[in-house]
Swiss-Prot record:
Single Gene Ontology BP annotation: endosome to plasma membrane protein transport
Ranges for region Required for WASH complex assembly: 1-54
Source species of the chain: Mus musculus (Mouse)
Record's protein name: WASH complex subunit 1
Subunit: Component of the WASH core complex also described as WASH regulatory complex SHRC composed of WASHC1, WASHC2, WASHC3, WASHC4 and WASHC5. The WASH core complex associates with the F-actin-capping protein dimer (formed by CAPZA1, CAPZA2 or CAPZA3 and CAPZB) in a transient or substoichiometric manner which was initially described as WASH complex. Interacts (via WHD1 region) with WASHC2; the interaction is direct. Interacts with BECN1; WASHC1 and AMBRA1 can competitively interact with BECN1. Interacts with BLOC1S2; may associate with the BLOC-1 complex.
Amino acid sequence: MTPVKTQCSLAGQLYAVPLIQPDLRREEAIQQVADALQYLQNISGDIFSRISRRVELSRRQLQAISERVSLAQAKIEKIKGSKKAIKVFSSAKYPAPEHLQEYGSIFTGALDPGLQRRPRYRIQSKHRPLDERALQEKLKYFPVCVNTKSEPEDEAEEGLGGLPSNISSISSLLLFNTTENLYKKYVFLDPLAGAVTKTHTMLGTEEEKLFDAPLSISKREQLERQAPENYFYVPDLGQVPEIDVPSYLPDLPGVADDLMYSADLGPGIAPSAPGAIPELPAFHTEVAEPLQPELENEVLLAAPPPPPPPPPPPPPAPTALVSTPQPPMFPDMATAAGQVAREEDSSSSMAHTASVQGAPKEVVDPSSGRATLLESIRQAGGIGKAKLRSVKERKLEKKKQKEQEQVRATSQGGDLMSDLFNKLVMRRKGISGKGPSTGTSEGPGGAFSRMSDSIPPLPPPQQPAGDEDEEDWES
């Protein structure tokens, strides 16, 4: 047979060991005792195994924490003797998971062994007959549940109590000339003035007197009004002591030697004031335009540098070389071509290596040209040694130069080389002060124009030229 399971466990408790029922037969009692002991053994083994697993898990967590502590201690010991400044960055959030793991009971998932099916045993012995006398004797040794709860006492009535038996009429029950039942609620009233209900509680408080008035009323005293406290935050630096210490203290334990603080920390932060944003100075940037060579009809022309402000004139632009063969020149151009050829003799020795390709490799530095100009002015003696001429002579010379230029322009054709030569001559005249671009000037202006005549022109940039160009110039 199967033992009867008693429900004597608490709420949430998984295990429940059955008790041995009384008045059992011998074989039945032995079988239930064996089942109960086996059940208790299974429960004990399950409980202790779960406790051991939880202890092992806690031990592993503690070991991991100990390893982290030892690692942090080793890092601290390593940087303890260092004299270098160390920056420590703190995380914006606390290093913890967003959702904490809830505590789990060690009995989670446990099954009650009592729910398993057990083998059934058949007992051949018969039950003993019921003995009432023996049952009464057992009440002396076993506790018996008796209802010991006390019944609530009758509440005290507010009236006179129960109705007497000698009342024969309604007028004897009610108070004279009223509708009040004194046996139900006891009141004191004047039958002619009206009923005023008074209970036992009111009767008890009626005998008490009022308390004495406070001193502020009896002695006419007034309490001093306290001023409200100001809880506004007013920052103040207070008295800061001035400490005179050296700026650098070497060989101090635990103090970094590569960290310097500036004494000028700017305006203080207390008391708080609206910070004004300083105005930044305006910067004007000038973008220099790059020189872009222009190729027209296979002619390489170098752009002249921007003219500097007067009085120092800009240096002359480098002469351009033509890759095509030179056409035959007119007789009046022979002398000018010979002069240009003599200027190119210095660079003709290096012109046999390569032909003209691309932009010139060397460009005359404008600063060196200005330095050469100033040096030439110093050598000429300045304005003091200049020979002044009259204005009429200068005007006559300019008229003659204009007439000669007009004659040359009409006599010369549209030859490319002649046009280039004319532009070169006009530029040199404009630099020397003989051209029409100079305008009429009086006083020191004419002296400068005459001084510029004695200044030699800047040497042209060295450009490699082919054999054909050299032969053309020599011819």
